[in-house]
Amino acid sequence: MSKEIPYKIYLEESEIPTSWYNVRSDMKIKPAPLLNPGTGQPLSLEELSPIFCEELCKQELDNDTAFFPIPDEIVKFYKMYRPSPLVRAYFLEEALGTPAKIYYKFEGNNTSGSHKLNSAIAQAYYAKKQGLKGVTTETGAGQWGTALSMACAYFGLDCKVYMVKISYEQKPFRREVMRVYGADVTASPSDTTEVGRKILEQFPGTTGSLGCAISEAVEVAVKNEGYRYVLGSVLNQVLLHQSIIGLETKAALDKYGIKPDTIIGCAGGGSNLGGLIAPFMGEKLRGEADYDIIAVEPASCPSFTRGKFAYDFCDTGMICPLAKMYTLGSGFIPSANHAGGLRFHGMSTILSQLYHDGYMRAVSAKQSEVFEAAELFAKCEGTLPAPESSHAIKAAIDEALKCKETGEEKTIVFGLTGTGYFDLKGYQQYNDGDLTDYIPTDEELEKGFAGLPNVEA
């Protein structure tokens, strides 16, 4: 006899995962190594150490260890907001009239409003353990910067945040939350760094990009003793920490004997998607199960769907290591009209390799469609979703409507990465009819590709 599925499935505190899962351990073809931009050779632990914390460098380079124990102090912090609920979207299902069963993993139940805290607290912990004075980082919409400022406040670390200029101006309240937690927040590009001044000279009036903010944060970290750079997405270590999302999701589904057919996540740099799909992808890689895994990205920043699989810089200033990923070119800057987040030009090397090898697929969505889906979800499910999360909502709705046509009773799981209460400018533009769907032309993309470094893949 099947159990009745509650609206929210909660794990017990004692069921919080005590190890992170490293999906690379099950990948037959490993992600290509990070390269030293000067020599073109794979980066060593010693070369990475001036940029990242020592323990995080080890996590970054380890392709073989399947599980990393989560330190007790991090588990203790996780208990403030974890386990997060897995929610059955009964009201959305009813509104769509679909036979599909829809679930979402809600990661917005903390002050940062998103999943970003899962990795922020881990990276701050290792920085504190190493005896560092502080860390530097970039942030786009502000969720990562907020999460890191919280984590740094908890461990008594300095936190310097370079925030993409367009978001700095559009989201002043997110900036203020960071300042509440003691962070020093600077609009990027800025005149406080060498690379920032260079970009301002090259592109007067630019609204910035994540690639630009990364360059500034890295420069400050390497030039100031006692500081290291930390990143909220893209890196292997970040996807490792975020695996807690997928591990909890799978544990909650297993409690009720539920096997998903489709797993959907929004994709900018890949932290949420990589974390959500981790244990399911592991099963797929080991041949134990099969899932339809879908990455959803903005049509205005289409790394997977229109990008190239090549070595590229992770930053606009071209000072970071080279990563083999799906990329639009490190010089690509999304339109200032793009309100939906997910503005990074590249993608996680892990997800890039998995996509290249056919283990997952990708779709893109126009931001007007994304906000339409977001408002339907808000009306049905009672939570105002972040624009980033709403890309996954859009794809989940599309898949559910396909089931309505075919009569299939598929089980769909997606990641609700966070809340949209600081993203009301985008909602305002949508409701006022001022939101435009910017889609880069082939010619614009070719300009970005022309700047790709000449590296033997």
Task: Locate predicted features.
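Alpha-helix C-terminal capping segments
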Residues: 122-132, 146-158, 179-180, 277-287, ...
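Claisen-condensing/thiolase-fold acyl-transfer catalytic domains that form or cleave C-C bonds
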Residues: 267-275, 367-433
